[in-house]
């Protein structure tokens, strides 16, 4: 199995995301991790991951292949055989943007900021107001759908300073960057002089400094808020592990983010999912299988009693129609099985025989008769050994 991270997880989008959603997520993350802007040790690796994920998910054919077969399907098709340049992807998406002034100007162009400079607060707030939270549910909750009470911490506009960060509203223009929020750096490269803009360390990109800081938020403009929300989760979560709850992310002034709920499904010791079908292995006493009788089987709703016909063999399958999960995914992307209700597939497994008394064993021996399958095996075995001796 591939050790690569899930492409949807990398771009922080759900499996039902539109191309517009995917492109928007890519632009945000590509800017965040671009090595010329982010100096963290792992930024370049994350930048490559983001670009690789976008190259696949932005292409309908590659996306369908990935949705159906995962990374292994892409490997088989030759996608991961080299020649991938993440900067080619980045440049194709951001073609038409002016990079001469550095990344600060790109932010202004992309997000429509009227002012110059990296302190474009609209951009920073837009990418920061979305919130990712993780919850765990069990297999039956996912299969049947459930409503979970989700408790998490988000940030909201500080009520004391109304998001200004100042206790008295008095702010001072930063003298280091003259209110621009950025400092210009020039460096010589093989391609000539390259000019970049980096965040002003004095004002942290705000263009202003605060004399009397708000005591409640310590000039951070936002404070923590613990919230609880009831979230509905359906069986699609098996294949779309991110549930988006609109308007429940961070809140800053008039900007309201979304809650990206990453759902982890705990594995079941009883059930196994195959497409939209649910497989369950049931242990049966061999004598009950031979003579027939009633057995108990687990379904997604309850424990059910069914009649087992005489002569049931080890490995026999009993299919209960519409006993699987009900998926409502785009069949054009996932396939026909992912847009309908599946079946419950019961696999019969012989348990170890019960212990019997000598009298019971003697009585059972009376019913032993030649077994055609055993006889055939013994014939083949003898033939194999006889051929060996004759050589």
UniProtKB/Swiss-Prot annotation:
Keywords: Chaperone, Cytoplasm, DNA replication, Metal-binding, Repeat, Stress response, Zinc, Zinc-finger. It is found in: Cytoplasm. Signal peptide: none annotated. Zn(2+) 2 binds at residues 174, 177, 200, 203. The keyword DNA repair does not apply. CXXCXGXG motif repeats lie at residues 158-165, 174-181, 200-207, 214-221. Its cofactor is Zn(2+). InterPro entries: DnaJ, DnaJ_C, DnaJ_domain, DnaJ_domain_CS, HSP40/DnaJ_pept-bd, HSP_DnaJ_Cys-rich_dom, HSP_DnaJ_Cys-rich_dom_sf, J_dom_sf. Zn(2+) 1 binds at residues 158, 161, 214, 217. GO terms for cellular component: cytoplasm. One of its GO terms (molecular function) is ATP binding. Pfam families: DnaJ, DnaJ_C, DnaJ_CXXCXGXG. A zinc finger (CR-type) spans 145-226. One of its GO terms (biological process) is protein refolding. Residues 6-70 form the J domain. Binds 2 Zn(2+) ions per monomer. Belongs to the DnaJ family. The J domain is necessary and sufficient to stimulate DnaK ATPase activity. Zinc center 1 plays an important role in the autonomous, DnaK-independent chaperone activity of DnaJ. Zinc center 2 is essential for interaction with DnaK and for DnaJ activity. Participates actively in the response to hyperosmotic and heat shock by preventing the aggregation of stress-denatured proteins and by disaggregating proteins, also in an autonomous, DnaK-independent fashion. Unfolded proteins bind initially to DnaJ; upon interaction with the DnaJ-bound protein, DnaK hydrolyzes its bound ATP, resulting in the formation of a stable complex. GrpE releases ADP from DnaK; ATP binding to DnaK triggers the release of the substrate protein, thus completing the reaction cycle. Homodimer. This is Chaperone protein DnaJ. It comes from Mycoplasmoides gallisepticum (strain R(low / passage 15 / clone 2)) (Mycoplasma gallisepticum).
């Amino acid at each position: 199995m591939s050790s690569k991270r899930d492409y949807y997880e990398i771009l922080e989008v759900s499996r039902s995301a539109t191309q517009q959603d995917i492109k928007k997520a890519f632009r945000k993350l590509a800017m965040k991790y671009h090595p010329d802007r982010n100096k963290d040790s792992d930024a370049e690796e994350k930048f490559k991951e983001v670009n690789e994920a976008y190259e696949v998910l932005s292409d309908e054919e590659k996306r369908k292949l990935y949705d159906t077969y995962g990374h292994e399907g892409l490997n088989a098709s030759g996608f991961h055989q080299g020649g991938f340049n993440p900067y080619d992807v980045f440049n194709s998406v951001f073609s038409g943007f002016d990079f001469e002034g550095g990344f600060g100007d790109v932010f202004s162009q992309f997000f429509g900021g009227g002012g110059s400079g990296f302190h474009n607060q609209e951009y920073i707030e837009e990418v920061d107001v979305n919130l990712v939270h993780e919850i765990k549910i069990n297999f039956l909750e996912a299969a049947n759908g459930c409503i979970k009470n989700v408790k998490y911490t988000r940030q909201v506009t500080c009520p004391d300073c109304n998001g200004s960060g100042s206790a008295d509203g008095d702010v001072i223009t930063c003298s280091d960057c003259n209110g621009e929020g950025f400092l210009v750096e020039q460096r010589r490269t093989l391609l000539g002089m390259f000019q970049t803009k980096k965040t002003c360390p004095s004002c942290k990109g705000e263009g202003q400094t605060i004399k009397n800081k708000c005591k409640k938020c310590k000039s951070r403009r936002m404070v923590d808020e613990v919230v609880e929300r009831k979230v509905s989760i359906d069986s699609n979560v098996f294949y779309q592990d991110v549930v988006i709850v609109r308007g429940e992310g961070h809140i800053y002034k008039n900007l309201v983010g979304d809650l990206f709920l990453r759902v982890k499904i705990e594995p079941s010791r009883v059930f196994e999912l195959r497409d939209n079908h649910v497989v369950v292995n049931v242990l049966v006493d061999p004598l009950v299988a031979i003579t027939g009788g009633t057995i108990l089987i687990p379904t997604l709703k309850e424990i059910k009693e069914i009649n087992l016909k005489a002569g049931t063999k080890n490995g026999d399958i009993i299919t209960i129609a519409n006993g699987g999960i009900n998926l409502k995914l785009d069949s054009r992307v996932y396939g026909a099985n992912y847009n309908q209700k599946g079946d419950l597939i019961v696999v019969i497994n012989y348990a170890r025989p019960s212990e019997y008394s000598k009298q019971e064993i003697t009585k059972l021996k009376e019913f032993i008769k030649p077994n055609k399958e055993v006889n055939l095996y013994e014939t083949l075995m003898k033939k194999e050994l006889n051929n060996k001796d004759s050589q």
